[in-house]
Amino acid sequence: MDFPERVAGAISACDIALIKRPLELSTDGHRTTGSPNLLTRPKILPVSSFPPIRRALISVSDKSGLVDFAKGLVSLGVEIYSTGGTRKHLLDNGVTAHEVASYTGFPEVMDGRVKTLHPKIFGGILARRNREDDLASLRSHGILEFDLVVVNLYPFETTVQKPDTVLTEAIEQIDIGGPSLLRAAAKNHEFVSVASQPNQYATILAEMKTHGGTSDSLRLQLAFDCFGETARYDATIADYLCRTILSNETFNPRGDEPSHSGLASIAMPQSITIPMKLQSGLRYGENPHQSAALYRLPGNSKATLTDAKQLNGKELSYNNLLDLDNALSIVRCFAKPSAVVMKHNNPCGGASAHKLSFACRKALAGDPQSAFGGVLGFNAMVDLETAEELCQPGLFIEAIVAPDFSPEAISLLQTKPKWRENVRLMKTGPLGTQPIELCYRFISGGVLVQQSDNQPPTSLNWKTVTDVAVAEELWDDIAFGWEMVRHVKSNAIILARDAALVGVGAGQMSRVDSVELAIEKAADRSHGSILASDAFFPFADSIERASKAGIIAIIQPGGSRKDDEVIAACNAHRIPMIFTGQRHFKH
């Protein structure tokens, strides 16, 4: 006997031994040890590749398209069971629907918190139609099969987007039964169809009309969509609770004493799930060979780009969105009418004034050459005067974001400039302040997470460290410059005069090079300007250069080992300097 025959013989003998081996039972009759008895395996029944849908369970919050869908199901002989408001909606529109509570024998309780959480519901969803033992269990307990589950969830995301929503209101919009029903149906997608979104109704009906049931591929796709929906729903809840914790200044999960060192004291979450939903595809990413899309995050109650209404122009690009977002972050920091000009995600111009049109003019004058092809942001409604500033000859603008645009401004921007058909006009509504959020940066094998650097600036900890004091008339420019510099890529230096940027040095590897660049951009406007630096000066060379350029005040975090040398240089050149104690790196 050769090797294959010996192996076959051994396998055959093993099979016979397993079949003949009696079950080892405990005193109560349950099997305790031994191999499974092949003769006790459940009987597997044949099933159709298009399982028929005879009975549907429907319980939805979003009732759009539901009546037509339900009528289509009834016309195909489907029996409908439903709950509360959904059943009333169906009955009011002439669709017969059995009451779930009458079927289960258990009423809806606790203000509707418990409706469908019952074995007679979940058994009918989870039963495997090809298992004789599962079907026997249904029969013995009087459980009906549900072949289609139609559920969408309480509007938690919509609720928490309202600015006046409190935690107790949000909690009541956390759906419990809905996700459970969806997950049960999706798990048993081999036999059960699940509709978690109204846009799936037409596809389900079309297959039912053609085949009498749904295909394996459709049920798998519906299950995939369903698990994505429930995962995003739970992640949205976790995200909201995380935001709630971050916004509570007194919250200290570690229970230790509050930090007064300027260092972060809030513990980061142990795990994070980022809920995102596709909002739109983009033509490409930063470069034409990169695919890209815009995804929406939940829970935004303030003005955002994902909520903004586009009033004019071509579709937004990946780079447009980056510039618009930073522009929005900058202008919402100022109380006075303000404007900013963005280029490659850095401000090349920015200003505040008593009128928006003046702020716009000053912002464009910050770096007129770089402003060409830029993106503009405003914190007040763009009126006709401001629009006229934007229509100056030789200026080309990619996109503009603002809380609103007057009809006259829209009309002018759509008709006068050469770029009228292309400029994207984005209306956000009232801006408000930007909440502290978590920011994410993907690295190889992981994600860096930090709080956003948008805490309102405070001068309480500012300290004049030089012998010469700051002139009273300079404080507005100093505050303006300190707010602007944190939005510039490090190493960041800005020069400001009369509440306007006159020079920006961004992204240089050496701080003195950023100083040189800002002075070069400002030219003769550097005389009488203030200088703001996002981090300390490691050497006194930047002070020497600032003095030659006519800079009359400096604000910076401090903290260098050579602070004494830097302070001495400022004293020597009679330049007042403020230490803020807070760094604003941006990488």
Descriptions of predicted regions:
Residues 38-103:
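N-terminal glycine-/serine-/threonine-rich phosphate-binding loop
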Residues 376-377, 383-387, 391-392, 524-563:
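Cysteine/selenocysteine-centered motifs that mediate thiol-based redox chemistry or coordinate metal-sulfur cofactors
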Residues 85-156, 252-254, 258:
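Glycine-rich nucleotide/cofactor/substrate-binding loop typically near the N-terminus or early
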Residues 9-14, 18-20, 26-36:
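Short, low-complexity, charge-dense intrinsically disordered segments
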Residues 199-453, 474-484, 488-492:
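Active-site loops and adjacent core secondary-structure elements that bind or stabilize anionic groups
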Residues 348-368, 500-543:
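Glycine- and Gly-Pro-enriched alpha-helical subdomains that act as flexible
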Residues 129-176, 183-185, 469-472:
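Active-site/ligand-binding-proximal alpha/beta "capping" segment
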Residues 396-407, 545-585:
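C-terminal binding/interaction regions
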